[in-house]
């Protein structure tokens, strides 16, 4: 259908699964570049509000998100590629949450790795749910709704100037 040889995927990627994994890895590389930016703000919370908004914007504006978070996301090759990419994002997120704990914005009771996995999984699922809605989701509204849940689940302290 794309006007190329059926053997192209096998020649360059070894298999159809290899091609799919390469596309998924490219998506997650672009996601990681956005999520791992240094955001401006006086407090951890101010920076994270900006990070959540940027990630939500990426998910909503990236055409492949609907496909990846939909039926394709259940294939074993996608889940395998996604797992490796998410492990890197969780590691970076854990460092970020640990910094929020050291700054006194977050309580130290939560394990940073578990908290990062929870936040990233919730962000993905909330976006997936919003994309299944017939109306196009609004970036700001969805980002705000997700941020409220993140802040509450992590126990963001009231006096943290968020």
Language-model segments: residues:
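Hydrophobic alpha-helical connector segments
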Residues: 22, 33-64, 112, 116-119, ...
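Helical hydrophobic small-molecule/effector-binding pocket
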Residues: 46-70, 84-95, 120, 151-159
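Amphipathic alpha-helical packing segments from all-alpha helical-bundle domains
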Residues: 29-32, 57, 77-103, 113-117, ...
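Transmembrane helix-loop junctions in multipass membrane proteins, especially transporters and channels
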Residues: 130-137
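Conserved hydrophobic residue
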Residues: 106-107
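Helix-turn-helix
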Residues: 1-18, 22
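Short linear capping/connector segments at secondary-structure termini
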Residues: 69-77
